[in-house]
């Protein structure tokens, strides 16, 4: 049998041990007394080194050993460990619930009793926001600073971080900021006598031209006229309601509805004040820009057709009809007909370019 036939048929033969391997197999299967020389053979240092390299413990980049879920770290926990973890979780949940309950209680008390002092409110908030339930409240730092304004009066301004957002009870409710009227002027009832007195005071203003007195003039402050009711509201000293938007003139002063702007005395020329003080002139109500509709934009232009009886709407051709009417194709599959003059754009392009 040739070598080729032996190698070709080697896969079909039954696996049998060769003669050279039979003593080693017998030595492994039998006792060590049969061949004592094989048992006394020691492994080389190279083999031990290779085994140590293969069995080196695995380590993650963060220095921890990998946990595949079947090791001692990821195995089943004992009953004692489970009980300990459950108690710890229950304690954390109870502390969180107590802190939320305390915070809700403090907020309710703050809304019911707004007369609480700043110190008490800050202490309760700090105590509720602390991590541990037994944390001692810290005293709020005093951030109040005294600032002296240009009139020589000292005012106390406190930091918004340590003060609650509570409006004082004596805050003036005048939305226009006019010092000539009481603070809560929009709560007063309608008084026709007071309105008549105000109109008489307006009529007493000088009508004719004349020099103005600049002794008590302050630069940057324009004379403020009493508020006039907007259209649709009954006349009264209340002025526009507090929810109406307030417009400002070029000097930064509030500008009332239906009231012409008062000029600022910035020159020595006489100023005629009869426009705003004359009771005989009718009041001009400005038109509402929301109700104004341009008729030219609302309806399309109409052209009279002499041949027909009714008007015809002037319509423009659409883009599709314009494209179809302006383009006539004289070519078919890239080639022009014999009756037309061939153009360079209509000729077929070669494929090798």
Curated annotation (Swiss-Prot):
Biological processes, Gene Ontology terms: mRNA processing; nuclear-transcribed mRNA catabolic process, nonsense-mediated decay
Alphabetical UniProt keywords: Cytoplasm, mRNA processing, Nonsense-mediated mRNA decay, RNA-binding
Residue numbers spanned by region Disordered: 1-100, 129-156, 169-189, 218-253, 296-353
Comp. bias regions, Pro residues: 224-244
Compositionally skewed regions (Basic and acidic residues) per UniProt: 89-100
Keyword RNA-binding assigned: yes
Keyword RNA-binding carried by entry: yes
Gene Ontology MF annotations: RNA binding
Signal peptide: none
One of the record's GO cellular component terms: cytoplasm
Coiled-coil residue spans: none
Polar residues biased stretches: 1-34, 305-318, 342-353
Localization of this protein: Cytoplasm
Entries under InterPro entries matching the protein: PNRC-like_rgn
Task of the protein: mRNA-binding protein which stimulates mRNA decapping.
Family: Belongs to the EDC family.
Protein name, entry field: Enhancer of mRNA-decapping protein 1
Organism: Candida glabrata (strain ATCC 2001 / BCRC 20586 / JCM 3761 / NBRC 0622 / NRRL Y-65 / CBS 138)
Lineage: Eukaryota, Fungi, Dikarya, Ascomycota, Saccharomycotina
């Amino acid at each position: 049998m040739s070598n080729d036939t032996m190698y070709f048929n080697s896969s079909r033969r039954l696996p049998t041990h060769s003669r050279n391997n039979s003593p080693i197999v017998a030595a492994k299967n039998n006792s060590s007394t049969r061949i004592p020389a094989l048992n006394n053979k020691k492994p080389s240092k190279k083999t031990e080194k290779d085994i140590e390299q293969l069995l080196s413990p695995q380590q993650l980049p963060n220095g921890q050993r990998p946990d595949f879920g079947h090791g001692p770290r990821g195995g089943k926990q004992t009953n004692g460990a489970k009980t300990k973890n459950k108690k710890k979780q229950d304690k954390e949940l109870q502390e969180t619930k107590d802190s939320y309950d305390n915070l809700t209680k403090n907020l309710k008390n703050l809304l019911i009793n707004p007369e609480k002092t700043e110190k008490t409110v800050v202490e309760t908030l700090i105590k509720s926001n602390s991590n541990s339930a037994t944390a001692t409240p810290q005293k709020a730092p005093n951030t109040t600073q005294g600032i002296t304004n240009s009139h020589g009066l000292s005012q106390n301004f406190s930091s918004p971080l340590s003060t609650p957002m509570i409006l004082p009870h004596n805050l003036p409710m005048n939305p226009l900021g006019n010092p000539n009227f009481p603070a809560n002027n929009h709560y007063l009832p309608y008084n026709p006598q007071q309105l008549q007195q105000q109109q008489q005071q307006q009529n007493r203003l000088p009508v004719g031209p004349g020099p103005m007195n600049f002794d008590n003039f302050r630069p940057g402050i324009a004379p403020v006229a009493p508020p006039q009711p907007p259209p649709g509201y009954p006349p009264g000293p209340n002025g526009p309601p507090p929810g109406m938007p307030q417009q400002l003139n070029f000097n930064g002063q509030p500008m009332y509805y239906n009231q012409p702007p008062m000029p600022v005395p910035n020159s020595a020329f006489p100023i005629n004040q009869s426009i705003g003080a004359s009771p005989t002139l009718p009041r001009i109500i400005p038109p509402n820009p929301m109700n104004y509709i341009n008729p030219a934009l609302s309806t399309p232009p109409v052209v009279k057709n002499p041949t027909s009886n009714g008007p015809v709407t002037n319509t423009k051709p659409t883009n599709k009809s314009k494209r179809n009417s302006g383009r006539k194709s004289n070519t078919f599959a890239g080639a022009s007909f014999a009756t037309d003059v061939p153009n360079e754009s209509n000729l077929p392009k070669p494929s090798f370019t």
